[in-house]
From Swiss-Prot:
One of its GO terms (cellular component) is extracellular region. Displays antimicrobial activity against the Gram-negative bacterium A.hydrophila. This is Antimicrobial peptide AJN-10. The lineage of its organism: Eukaryota, Metazoa, Chordata, Craniata, Vertebrata. One of its GO terms (biological process) is defense response to bacterium. It is found in: Secreted. Keywords: Antibiotic, Antimicrobial, Secreted. Disulfide bonds: none annotated. It comes from the Eukaryota.
Length: 20
């Protein structure tokens, strides 16, 4: 689960976070 943080909202960084 990717935490709802401003960093994870970035597409590039979000791609490195697990889905959800």
């Amino acid at each position: 689960g990717c935490p709802q943080t401003p960093r994870c909202t970035n597409y590039a960084e979000k791609g490195q976070c697990p889905p959800n």
